Amino acid sequence: MQNQIISLSRSLIQRKSISPNDEGCQQLIAERLQAVRFKLEWLPFGDTLNLWATHGEGEPCLAFAGHTDVVPEGDESQWTYPPFSAEIVDDMLYGRGAADMKGSLAAMVIACETFVKNNPNHQGKIALLITSDEEAAAKDGTVKVVETLMQRQEPIHYCVVGEPSSTKQLGDVVKNGRRGSITANLYIEGIQGHVAYPHLAENPVHTALPFLSELTAYQWDNGNEFFPPTSLQIANIKAGTGSNNVIPGELYVQFNLRYCTEVNDEIIKTKVAEMLRKYGLKHRIEWNLSGKPFLADNGKLVQATIQAVENVTQITPKLDTGGGTSDGRFIALMGAEVVEFGPINQTIHKVNECVNVNDLGKCGEVYYQILCSVIPN
């Protein structure tokens, strides 16, 4: 499979699919899948192209999820090799999206192709959910496909997301969950005035300091065996006109929480509201829930993934829930068991992003073995 995976990876990288543009990547994949009798369904939403491709019927449904969009390349002059040339040097494939995640997407496609060729009459359903809206807004991609599938009661029981989960060597980490993410945009009201006449004004920076001190020091929980403790970080803060003689009339604070399963978004909102009342702050607050935490405990897919990684790489992966959010958060809402496995992530979103071509071949082998374990054939 390795040569096919490398060839498809290069073809995908050579398409400059800056999010949410797909630039023909999904069409290329669709043609391959159609050749091995996958049913194709195009699900465009807004400026995003999504592909739902299936082979077989019934249960269980094992889906592979990935994205064709990439982040911008930045200053191309900083790259050793052009970011969309997909050059291979010393067994390393260079290019934007090589590791995140056109390489693993190609590996998933070839693994599914190979499996259905070898097992044309398999039981259950194999699916690929591919979007071009993961790196940017993530509003019209996987989340919309999941909503569509749920509306028509079409389940996904197991899902492998091809995000680059490995850290130092292929297979050292498998993600079996992710923390939730919620952001607050908080506006604290004051009274603008002259700095020489503070008695005629109300400085929202000063009045908010005790609240911010408590907010940043508060311990939400102690985490658990699967998740680290919930953490809060102030991301942006702004007040004032830029002049040194004007007391600001408003303070804007944006903060984000990455939270574990010991709390939920309603607990967080309630506690923050309680703190704001405690200090008598005039305010308005807007919340944006990016994703709830999810965890695939020691289920069938987790065990199949661990076994496949051990067979292919000869190492036992660590199960981990750290890092940012992924599209797995949307698929988990269906009740699916979700894991993430893919190449080494050390160069993702960086200049000279690259992936080892041998690792891509091994990714394909892992995905193939997962198929053999989960789908009756």
Curated annotation (Swiss-Prot):
Taxonomic lineage: Bacteria, Pseudomonadati, Pseudomonadota, Gammaproteobacteria, Pasteurellales
Pathway involvement of the protein, from the record: Amino-acid biosynthesis; L-lysine biosynthesis via DAP pathway; LL-2,6-diaminopimelate from (S)-tetrahydrodipicolinate (succinylase route): step 3/3
Gene Ontology molecular-function annotations: acetylornithine deacetylase activity; cobalt ion binding; succinyl-diaminopimelate desuccinylase activity; zinc ion binding
Keywords: Amino-acid biosynthesis, Cobalt, Diaminopimelate biosynthesis, Hydrolase, Lysine biosynthesis, Metal-binding, Zinc
GO aspect biological process, one term: L-arginine biosynthetic process
This protein's name: Succinyl-diaminopimelate desuccinylase
Species annotation: Glaesserella parasuis serovar 5 (strain SH0165) (Haemophilus parasuis)
EC number, UniProt record: 3.5.1.18
Assembly information from the UniProt record: Homodimer.
Function noted in UniProt: Catalyzes the hydrolysis of N-succinyl-L,L-diaminopimelic acid (SDAP), forming succinate and LL-2,6-diaminopimelate (DAP), an intermediate involved in the bacterial biosynthesis of lysine and meso-diaminopimelic acid, an essential component of bacterial cell walls.
Cofactor annotation remark: Binds 2 Zn(2+) or Co(2+) ions per subunit.
Catalytic-site annotation from UniProt: 69, 134
Broad class of enzyme this protein falls into: hydrolase
Keyword Hydrolase part of the UniProt annotation: yes
Binding site for Zn(2+) 2: 100, 135, 349
Catalytic reaction equation(s): N-succinyl-(2S,6S)-2,6-diaminopimelate + H2O = (2S,6S)-2,6-diaminopimelate + succinate
Named cofactor requirement(s): Zn(2+); Co(2+)
Positions of Zn(2+) 1 binding: 67, 100, 163
Keyword Repeat in annotation: no
Pfam families noted in UniProt: M20_dimer, Peptidase_M20
Family recorded in the similarity comment: Belongs to the peptidase M20A family. DapE subfamily.
